[in-house]
Curated annotation (Swiss-Prot):
Record HAMAP family: Idi
All residue ranges annotated as the Nudix hydrolase domain in the record: 26-160
Cofactor(s), by name: Mg(2+); Mn(2+)
Binding sites annotated in the UniProt record for Mg(2+): 62, 82
Organism: Ruegeria pomeroyi (strain ATCC 700808 / DSM 15171 / DSS-3)
InterPro entries associated with the record: Idi_bact, IsopentenylPP_isomerase_typ1, NUDIX_hydrolase-like_dom_sf, NUDIX_hydrolase_dom
Pathway(s) the chain acts in: Isoprenoid biosynthesis; dimethylallyl diphosphate biosynthesis; dimethylallyl diphosphate from isopentenyl diphosphate: step 1/1
One Gene Ontology molecular-function label: metal ion binding
Name by which UniProt lists this protein: Isopentenyl-diphosphate Delta-isomerase
Major place of residence: cytoplasm
């Protein structure tokens, strides 16, 4: 048995092996974080060793909480584990649900708590090569244009967040400023 995450089985929240949850398409909890500095968003390219969506661009970090872990604790933990980021305390923005085929017989059927972390000042980022192969800061408008032009380069959930939940995640200031 691998990592246990919170998933719904017969309308009950129970601990389920993470791989099993994806193979069976079980609805499960997830956490996504966006780090924003001025008008730029930190995105990551997933490591090639990931069991689904390897090599695709995603938001700053995304994961599943451990069975007994709160979403906010999970967000801080995964910023540290995936990107070596400490000292950021993401604020809760939104809960959303989505369902997406992520290839290799895997399905994301997630109830996601989304967090936004405002970066003020220098930020040391040290990607974990088992998780992340590349990072970059990109403006909101530029990210939308890239997703439109090369959708195959981005994870399904990032496209869903940008196309259907951006106002709630980022707020009007980032979106309006990015359009100007």
């Amino acid at each position: 048995m691998g990592i246990l995450i919170p998933a719904w089985v017969d309308d009950r929240l129970v601990p389920v092996d993470k791989l099993e949850a994806h193979e069976k398409g079980l609805k499960h909890k997830a956490v996504s974080v966006f780090a924003v500095r001025d008008m730029d968003i930190l995105i990551q390219r997933r490591a090639l060793g990931k069991y689904h969506t390897p090599g695709l661009w995603a938001n700053t970090c995304c994961t599943h909480p451990d069975w007994d872990e709160s979403a906010s604790t999970c967000a801080v933990r995964r910023l540290r584990e995936e990107l070596g980021i400490t000292g950021l305390y993401p604020e809760y923005r939104h809960r959303l649900e989505y369902h997406a085929d992520v290839g290799n017989g895997m399905v994301e059927n997630e109830v996601v708590d989304v967090f936004l972390a405002h970066v003020r000042g220098p930020l040391q980022v040290v990607p974990n090569p088992d998780e992340v192969m590349e990072i970059r800061w990109i403006g909101y408008h530029d990210l939308l244009a890239e997703v439109q032009r090369y959708p195959e380069r981005f994870t399904p959930w990032l496209k869903i967040y940008l196309h259907h939940h951006a106002d709630t995640i980022f707020g009007p200031d980032l979106i309006i400023s990015a359009k100007a």
